[in-house]
Amino acid sequence: MAHHIPPLNFGMVADDLYRSGQPNELNFPFLEKLQLKKIIFLAPDDPSQQFQNFVEDQDIELIHLGMDTHQNPWNPISEEIVISALKIILNPDNYPLHIMCNLGRHRTGTVVGCLRKLQRWNLTSIFEEYRRFAGSKVKLLNEQFIELFDTDLVTYNNAPQWLYLS
């Protein structure tokens, strides 16, 4: 019997939209159950070969947005990458969809935080969610990025229904 162990920092963002850190082979049976169509990978480095093989075997489209060669990996994620990720997230044709980075903390948390701004969550709630996943590794620059993020930069037509429920 296969065990269904979620990846590090796994969470459900909305219906058929998930977040986590990069999974390992122990997490693959769990991910299979999600029947993912696409994965947004936000880490600057390549995903592990095991993970790439899993994605290929499951016929999941892997979208690697984290490769920003002009940026120090310790800096916050770029606005361009966040906007690209949000455009993918706001297209219901991409669901079920999973957002991830190496540990599911900072890059993923920043994208989800900006998504929450689009949903018109208040900043206190956005930061509470970010901090829940970041733990003791909170980066104030990421919180500042989320706070100052201009949601008008994100254009979408046919967004998921849950975007309008808040």
UniProtKB/Swiss-Prot annotation:
A Pfam match: Y_phosphatase2
Q: What is the enzyme's class at the highest EC level?
A: hydrolase
PROSITE patterns per the UniProt record, alphabetical: TYR_PHOSPHATASE_DUAL
One MF term in GO for this entry? protein tyrosine phosphatase activity
Major localization class: cytoplasm
Per the record, what are the reactions this protein catalyses? Answer: O-phospho-L-tyrosyl-[protein] + H2O = L-tyrosyl-[protein] + phosphate
According to the entry, every stretch annotated as the Tyrosine-protein phosphatase domain falls at 9-162
Active-site residue list: 101 (phosphocysteine intermediate)
Keyword annotations: Cytoplasm, Hydrolase, Protein phosphatase
Q: Where in the cell is it found?
A: Cytoplasm
The record's GO CC annotations read:
cytoplasm
EC number(s) reported in the record? 3.1.3.48
Query: What family classification does the UniProt entry report for this protein?
Result: Belongs to the protein-tyrosine phosphatase family.
Q: What is this protein called?
A: Probable tyrosine-protein phosphatase DG1060
Q: Which organism is it from?
A: Dictyostelium discoideum (Social amoeba)
- Report which gene this protein is encoded by: DG1060
